[in-house]
Amino acid sequence: MANYISSVLKSLLLLLHLVFLIQQHVDSASIVKFLPGFEGSLPFELETGYIGIGEEEEVQLFYYFIKSERNPKEDPLLLWLSGGPGCSSISGLLFENGPLAMKLDVYNGTLPSLVPTTYSWTKTSSMIFLDQPVGTGFSYSRTQQYNKPSDSGEAKRIHEFLQKWLSKHQEFSSNPFYVAGDSYSGMVVPATVQEISKGNYQCCSPPINLQGYVLGNPITEHAIDYNYRIPFAHGMALISDELYESLKRVCKGEYVDPRDTECLKLVEEFSKCTKGVCQEVVIKPLCVTETPNCYIYRYLLTTYWVNDVNVRKALQINKESIGEWVRCYFGIPYTHDIKSSVPYHMNNSINGYRSLIYSGDHDLNVPFLATQAWVRSLNYSIIDNWRPWMIKDQIGGYTKTYANKMTFATVRGGGHTAEYKPYETYIMFHRWINGQPL
């Protein structure tokens, strides 16, 4: 009898614990109709919230969810991951492909303003902007007892996040689903796609309607990404013919951690030539955030805006989450355990998922030449050969389509992220997501 009572009590306690967790989930999502700095009510549907990850839900991942402005019942659902690792997804929302942007006014001590954009991907898709890994943006841990984030570990956490998010938003469970991101998320997105794909064939959880993924200037493999900086720099007239020929002859195409002393000297010469160049987009001036006439001044304005007490209140930020918000926390504890994401791309292709891989063609960090090289290494036949894609009568970039449902495209004049050419990138994405040729 005592054992029976004990068993019943345990069951009741477990039930109460589950009810408590469900209640926490319900309370953690909020509809946001007004944002400080934006005049009037928001012209789109915004939800913010936290999803608990792990057995004890010790990790709390923060997200911004914006419904498609076209037909949310049928339009695709995209998960957006910013790079870093450690860069808040606000980087995507306010700089790259969201419906709001910072107004570039000189900061005068008052709250910076927000303005609507004309290039939001939410015009045709619903989007979840996720702060990950833990410690990024407004995502935090309730305790110190959690696994240190890693590339492969994040793929599992993101998959868990999606399962829980979709269980709360079942009206989107049948929508075509895509994972998207840029920069360092090139290591995490392909692994996440594979993790979701595997999960769809396992028991106990409803399948996610995974259709494919989108990556911009993705970090893929350090040696490939770095080695192609030298030919890219030469093509952009950043180094001389003589230095380029010497580098090729002496280093034989391997420029990462050279052991040959002559090669090392030449690589150092290359570094001197490119030190004063803006790595993210070589045609922009190298400048500091605090300069009002500089493009990245918006990063400073965003920091002032996000750290305003009324903005945090509107976004329903848990007070226990973090102290000062930073756009990119580059010192985040993290294990880089995926050395190359190429095998993940291969597996995802074999499983039939669509992909759009695009490159701003003026990025020195991850040159388009590097991305082209690993795409070429997949050895798929070409369906649509290299050609310009147009916006009205202007060239938006160049594109090539492969038999594995992979489309590669450049964005002419673009940089390391979509923020440098947001309208052109939007046109490219809009066509691809709707199944149209670029």
From Swiss-Prot:
Subcellular location per UniProt equals: Secreted
Catalytic residues of the enzyme: 183, 363, 416
**Keyword hit for Glycoprotein:** yes
User: Any keyword Glycoprotein?
Assistant: yes
Per the UniProt entry, the signal peptide is 1-28
- Broad enzyme group: hydrolase
Q: Give a GO cellular-component term.
A: extracellular region
Glycosylated residues, chain numbering: 108, 347, 379
Spell out the protein name for this chain. Answer: Serine carboxypeptidase-like 5
Which species expresses this protein natively? Arabidopsis thaliana (Mouse-ear cress)
Gene (UniProt) = SCPL5
